A protein has these predicted regions:
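Conserved catalytic cores and adjacent C-terminal regulatory segments
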Residues: 1-145
Length: 145
């Protein structure tokens, strides 16, 4: 989670990424199933959090075992990245050019990870977002704005 938990009316709420690390598929399902929207009318701009390309900074040994995978959140971040890649591929198949994913490259040395909801992490994510916006090809982006 990139964001700290928040208490509202005595209930504790966590970052929604704990439920849907790539909510694109959930959004499309909700639009189709509950709102009756024809998928041919859907355009989706998906904004990532730089984890789709996650790889452990030091790599992982073939015989690392549970300790190697569980240290530094490697297993969790790998599972998040794989889910995001899977959902992105499905959305590209279903929506084609009507789907655009904006995401930064995972900065291995940037001190980002699970439960690192620090001011430094927020600054890093903001800087990654700014760079992504600067570098995006504006032509396909226009249909989403």
């Amino acid at each position: 989670a990139y964001f700290p938990s928040v208490e509202i009316d005595g209930a504790l709420y966590a970052d929604g990424g704990l439920f849907a690390v790539a909510p694109d598929q959930v959004a499309l399902h909700e639009a189709e199933h509950f709102m009756g929207i024809d998928v041919a009318r859907v355009r989706m701009l998906s904004i990532g959090t730089a984890t789709v390309g996650y790889q452990p900074a030091e790599g992982i040994d073939a015989d690392a075992g549970a300790v190697g995978w569980l240290s530094d959140g490697r297993l969790i971040l790998t599972l998040i990245a794989v889910q995001q890649q899977h959902v992105q591929a499905m959305m590209e198949d279903r929506l084609g050019a009507r789907y655009l994913r904006l995401d930064a490259e995972w900065p291995a040395d940037a001190a980002l990870g699970i439960d690192i909801a620090t001011p430094h992490a927020a600054q890093t994510l903001t800087a990654l977002a700014a760079r992504t916006v600067r570098e995006i090809d504006r032509k396909p982006l226009k249909m989403f704005l």
